[in-house]
Regions:
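Formylglycine-dependent sulfatase
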Residues: 1-157
Length: 157
């Protein structure tokens, strides 16, 4: 029986979680996953922009090979025949699911790379908000209703 694989990638996350020694952060579930799984201690992103970095990780190709250096280009538009990491797992009998913002896609490509996923990725309808849950969007609306001096400094959504 094949092992289960849970791949978690987070944009803009510094190592400010317990398993990386940040005692002031309370992250018990992530810490437990790290304790019983594989924790990378020397991992580096290929580029400081989320879409090209994720495409690099998931394709195994550097950005100079994918040709993606911004958030406006799509992996299949640049490399239509590349076999992605989830696609490799899918081709070998695994069920692969996309939760959150994995590949950037447009309204023209709402499936978020169907070659890679066993089921279509959930799509919100707005190409830049599809990874938010309804609860997250409601919370952002509440924050936006606050006086400007009480809002977070970088409120986007």
């Amino acid at each position: 029986m094949p092992l289960n694989v849970l791949f978690i990638a987070v944009d803009d996350l510094r190592p400010e979680i317990g398993c990386y020694g940040a005692a002031h952060m309370k992250t018990p579930h992530i810490d437990k996953l790290a304790e019983h799984g594989l924790l990378f201690e020397r991992a580096y992103c290929q580029v400081a922009v989320c879409n090209p970095s994720r495409n690099s990780i998931l394709s195994g190709c550097r950005p100079d090979t994918t040709g993606i250096f911004d958030n406006q280009h799509f992996l299949r538009g640049q490399m239509p025949d590349v076999v992605t990491l989830p696609q490799h797992f899918k081709n070998h009998g695994y069920t692969t699911l996309s939760l959150g913002k994995v590949f950037h896609h447009s309204e023209r490509e709402p499936g978020d790379d169907p070659q890679s996923w066993s089921e279509p990725a959930w799509y919100h309808g707005d190409p830049y908000k599809h990874w938010f849950t309804k609860e997250s969007l409601d919370y952002v609306k509440q924050l936006k209703a606050l006086p400007k001096d009480k809002q977070p400094k970088q409120l986007r959504a």
